[in-house]
């Protein structure tokens, strides 16, 4: 507890202990000067309140020794949302979340939270603020885009609202909010319509696969890695030869490439702990990889001293990791060349999972191969193809009507 006493000049000396880090009491102190003209009892009450605020500021990291601070500067409940986000929240999420997630959370905070609620004290934020935020996002004008008046999807609204909830959760943990009031169960969110996954059916996958025979060894290996093994884009780009065991026919996934705005491309651990995994591949796929490795050796010899050996499987002309956007561009051009409908590169991962399920692979195995944390994520691949649905309808009609 804070202690205080009155000096001869009428000011109060307030002391707070920060513990005994070296076996010796670590005390910090400050001075409270009551306003002139108030009674002794009022001055005593003011000193007591100030002592409580000072103690809270010390334990919450707001107090800076050697620097004069006003009462409102050390009041943990006087902090505005903008100040909390910029001074504290960003630092906390940078050590907890992935760089790409941090970038997204910051963009939502800067674009929406700070302009709308930045001047509100953290202690005054209520579920009504979150509800108004959700309602605004769900309205037609929330995109800040005159050319697109359509409202954000329900899933996107909830994703943005999660950032607001995250801010208040951290504020509660740090003592700036008395309680975590943004409980999701009391917020009315717009209806979320889950889009059906986009994947190639059997015939389209066969056209895709056969078309790869005409491509360069690197393009063939890159797209087959997505189609046959279901790796995420960042996992493909971050793959190294040391991760591959040709004798065992296995590949260890332990890193992912990423790129945030204004920063160079880098590597990080995969999306979740479940994403650190070993996947197995066929001899046919191994032959494709080995063919590419032979060509990569030739490229290295040709580049000479310009070659920057880092051990990446997929490289540019001087041995560096390829740009993370390149696989997406390669996939798009290849689909157009084959006359296939456009799928994002991630659609090859969906195709891989859907074909596994359709061909009898149990869902737990697919979950393990794909590195999903939750079985519900894997269950999206249980969605039948239109052709399978048509056969089911025909079979039922034949059974009843014949």
Set out the residue ranges of the language-model regions.
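Short, polar N-cap/turn motifs at the start of nucleic acid-interacting alpha helices
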Residues: 243-250, 342, 361-380
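N-terminal core-binding DNA-recognition domain of tyrosine recombinases/integrases
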Residues: 56-71, 87-99, 110-196, 210-211
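C-terminal secondary-structure termini that scaffold catalytic or DNA-interacting sites
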Residues: 139, 210, 248, 259-276, ...
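Active-site/catalytic core of tyrosine-dependent DNA strand-transfer enzymes
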Residues: 202-206, 282-340
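C-terminal catalytic core of tyrosine-transesterase DNA break-rejoin enzymes
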Residues: 173, 224, 228, 235, ...
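Catalytic-site neighborhood detector that most strongly recognizes the C-terminal catalytic loop/helix
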Residues: 191, 199, 256-259, 363, ...
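N-terminal DNA-binding module of tyrosine recombinases/phage integrases
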Residues: 20-124, 128-131, 294-309
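Basic, Lys/Arg- and aromatic-enriched nucleic-acid-binding interface segment
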Residues: 143, 147-154, 158-160, 173-240, ...
């Amino acid at each position: 507890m804070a202690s205080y006493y009155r000096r001869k000049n009428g000011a109060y000396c307030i002391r707070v202990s920060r513990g005994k880090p070296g076996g010796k009491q670590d005390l910090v102190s400050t001075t409270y000067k009551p306003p002139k003209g108030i009674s002794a009892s009022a001055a005593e009450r003011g000193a007591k309140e100030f002592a409580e605020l000072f103690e809270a500021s010390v334990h919450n990291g707001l107090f800076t020794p050697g620097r004069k601070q006003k009462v409102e500067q050390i009041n943990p409940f006087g902090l505005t949302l903008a100040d909390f986000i910029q001074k504290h929240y960003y630092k906390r999420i940078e050590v907890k979340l992935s760089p790409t997630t941090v970038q997204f959370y910051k963009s939502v905070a800067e674009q929406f939270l700070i302009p709308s609620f930045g001047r509100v004290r953290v202690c005054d934020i209520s579920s009504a603020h979150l509800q108004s935020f959700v309602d605004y996002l769900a309205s037609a004008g929330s995109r800040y885009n005159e050319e697109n008046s359509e409202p954000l999807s329900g899933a996107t609204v909830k994703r943005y609202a999660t950032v607001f909830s995250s801010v208040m959760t951290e504020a509660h943990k740090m003592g700036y909010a008395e309680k975590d009031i943004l409980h999701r169960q009391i917020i009315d969110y717009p209806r979320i319509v889950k889009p059906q996954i986009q994947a190639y059916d059997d015939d389209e996958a066969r056209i895709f696969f056969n078309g790869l025979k005409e491509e360069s060894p690197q393009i063939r290996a890159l797209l087959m890695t997505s189609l046959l093994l279901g790796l995420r884009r960042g996992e493909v780009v971050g793959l190294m030869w040391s991760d591959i065991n040709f004798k065992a026919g296995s590949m260890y996934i332990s890193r992912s490439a990423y790129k945030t705005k204004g920063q160079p491309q880098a590597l990080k651990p995969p999306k979740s702990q479940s994403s650190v995994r070993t996947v197995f591949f066929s001899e046919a796929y191994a032959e494709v990889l080995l063919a590419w490795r032979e060509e990569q050796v030739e490229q290295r010899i040709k580049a000479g001293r310009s070659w920057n050996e880092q051990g990446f499987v997929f490289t540019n002309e001087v041995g560096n990791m390829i740009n993370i956007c390149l696989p997406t561009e390669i996939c798009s051009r290849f689909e157009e060349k084959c006359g296939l409908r456009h799928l994002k590169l991630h659609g090859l991962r969906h195709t891989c999972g859907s074909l596994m399920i359709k061909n009898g692979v149990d869902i737990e195995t697919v979950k393990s191969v794909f590195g999903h944390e939750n079985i519900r994520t894997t269950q999206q691949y249980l969605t039948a193809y239109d052709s399978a649905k048509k056969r089911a309808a025909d079979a039922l009609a034949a059974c009843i009507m014949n």
